[in-house]
Regions:
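Non-heme di-metal
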Residues: 1-195
Length: 195
């Protein structure tokens, strides 16, 4: 049985070039994404306290994402890059989350888990690209370690969904959402941001 998510499209070279041209802004956005990822994991705990089988893993994920935020923040401090006072809206996340509206509470729960997997896998793919192309050795090492961690996160959300839903239902819906994510990511305006 597969747990990993295979994205339907790769990130473009134009996206990578945009990030490399303004890496300070990318770091600022990355820090905010890690903070939001931690909050998202805890929001599952708050919204679904009856799903006890996944709560320990959600808490562990939230802590790990918060540690990633701290690591990015420390990198920014060493490089003299401040946390921004205001972050841009994440159109990617807004469009993805719009796909989870409607349906029953159970299908929304399923879709939110699957969407979390897709988002983590997109982050993994992009962190890997950064690690392979950035010239700064410290940043290259950091992003190499980070993409391996994000790959694990992508897998755990699929595993969580499989605790509550049939394999066919999970993978059919996952395939639908992966295709929609590819459409969204391909249409995004280029900016030095994770999404």
């Amino acid at each position: 049985m597969k747990y990993s998510v295979e994205l339907a499209c790769d990130s473009s070279k134009a996206w990578l070039d945009t990030v490399m041209d303004d890496f300070g802004s990318f770091l600022q956005d990355h820090a905010d994404c890690e903070r939001k990822a931690s909050a998202m994991a805890m929001s599952f705990v708050a919204k679904y306290p009856n799903r006890k089988e996944i709560i320990p893993e959600l808490i562990e994920t939230a802590i790990e994402e918060l540690e990633h935020f701290q690591q990015v923040y420390n990198l920014m401090e060493r490089k003299g890059i401040a946390l921004p006072s205001e972050m841009q809206k994440d159109v990617y996340m807004q469009q993805l989350m719009a796909l989870t509206h409607g349906g029953t509470p159970d299908t929304r729960f399923r879709d939110r888990l699957l969407m979390a997997s897709i988002v983590e896998c997109r982050g993994c793919e992009r962190f890997k690209l950064v690690s392979e192309h950035i010239e700064d050795e410290e940043l290259s090492r950091f992003y190499k370690v980070l993409w391996a961690s994000e790959a694990k996160h992508g897998n755990i959300f699929v595993k969580m969904a499989l605790k509550y839903f049939e394999n066919k239902e999970v993978y059919d819906r996952l395939d639908e959402l992966i295709q929609k994510e590819a459409e969204i990511v391909s249409a995004l305006p280029l900016r030095p941001a994770l999404h």
